Amino acid sequence: MGSRKTALVKTRLMRALKRNREIPAWKRMMKEHKGEYNRARRHWRSKKLKIY
Protein backbone atom coordinates (compact mmCIF):
# COMPACT_ATOMS: atom_id res chain seq x y z
CA MET A 1 0.00 0.00 0.00
CA GLY A 2 1.33 3.41 -0.89
CA SER A 3 2.07 6.06 1.67
CA ARG A 4 0.21 8.82 -0.18
CA LYS A 5 -3.15 8.74 1.51
CA THR A 6 -5.63 11.52 2.05
CA ALA A 7 -6.65 12.50 5.56
CA LEU A 8 -10.09 10.95 5.02
CA VAL A 9 -8.63 7.57 4.10
CA LYS A 10 -6.25 7.67 7.07
CA THR A 11 -9.05 8.41 9.52
CA ARG A 12 -11.18 5.60 8.09
CA LEU A 13 -8.28 3.16 8.40
CA MET A 14 -7.63 4.22 11.99
CA ARG A 15 -11.31 3.82 12.82
CA ALA A 16 -11.37 0.34 11.32
CA LEU A 17 -8.24 -0.58 13.27
CA LYS A 18 -9.84 0.48 16.55
CA ARG A 19 -13.05 -1.43 15.83
CA ASN A 20 -11.19 -4.62 14.93
CA ARG A 21 -10.31 -5.47 18.53
CA GLU A 22 -11.84 -8.18 20.66
CA ILE A 23 -13.84 -7.55 23.82
CA PRO A 24 -11.52 -7.37 26.86
CA ALA A 25 -11.17 -10.57 28.90
CA TRP A 26 -12.22 -8.85 32.15
CA LYS A 27 -15.44 -7.73 30.53
CA ARG A 28 -16.15 -11.19 29.15
CA MET A 29 -15.77 -12.70 32.61
CA MET A 30 -18.65 -10.60 33.92
CA LYS A 31 -21.98 -12.35 34.29
CA GLU A 32 -23.92 -10.24 31.75
CA HIS A 33 -21.32 -10.69 29.03
CA LYS A 34 -20.92 -14.47 29.09
CA GLY A 35 -20.42 -15.83 25.59
CA GLU A 36 -20.14 -12.39 24.06
CA TYR A 37 -17.51 -11.62 21.45
CA ASN A 38 -16.93 -9.13 18.67
CA ARG A 39 -18.94 -10.31 15.66
CA ALA A 40 -17.64 -7.47 13.50
CA ARG A 41 -14.07 -8.75 13.70
CA ARG A 42 -12.45 -9.10 10.29
CA HIS A 43 -9.25 -10.58 8.97
CA TRP A 44 -7.19 -8.28 6.77
CA ARG A 45 -6.82 -10.92 4.09
CA SER A 46 -10.31 -12.39 3.89
CA LYS A 47 -12.54 -9.32 4.12
CA LYS A 48 -11.56 -6.00 2.60
CA LEU A 49 -12.65 -2.53 3.63
CA LYS A 50 -14.55 -0.39 1.15
CA ILE A 51 -12.90 2.96 1.79
CA TYR A 52 -11.64 4.00 -1.62
Swiss-Prot record:
PROSITE patterns: RIBOSOMAL_L39E. One of its GO terms (biological process) is translation. GO terms for cellular component: ribonucleoprotein complex; ribosome. Keywords: Ribonucleoprotein, Ribosomal protein. InterPro entries: Ribosomal_eL39, Ribosomal_eL39_CS, Ribosomal_eL39_dom_sf. The keyword Nucleotidyltransferase does not apply. GO terms for molecular function: structural constituent of ribosome. HAMAP family: Ribosomal_eL39. Interacts with YIH1. Belongs to the eukaryotic ribosomal protein eL39 family. This is Large ribosomal subunit protein eL39. It comes from Encephalitozoon cuniculi (strain GB-M1). The gene is RPL39.
